[in-house]
Amino acid sequence: VTSYTLNEIVPLKDVVPEWVRIGFSATTGAEFAAHEVLSWSFHSELEETSASKQ
């Protein structure tokens, strides 16, 4: 069994609205394969703005 790891830091606040849903898609062309997400991790930090501190 071959295992791959994908790790990417993306500043989502620059490209998506405040509320989003995340999905996955995979393909192997004409061949059949099972794609499984065995682990998922999400980390978010909310930075306070001057308006939210008031």
Swiss-Prot record:
InterPro entries: ConA-like_dom_sf (IPR013320), Lectin_LegA_CS (IPR000985), Legume_lectin_dom (IPR001220). Pfam families: Lectin_legB. Disulfide bonds: none annotated. One of its GO terms (molecular function) is carbohydrate binding. SUPFAM superfamilies: Concanavalin A-like lectins/glucanases (SSF49899). Signal peptide: none annotated. Keywords: Lectin. Tetramer of two alpha and two beta chains. Belongs to the leguminous lectin family. This is Lectin alpha chain. It comes from Lathyrus tingitanus (Tangier pea).
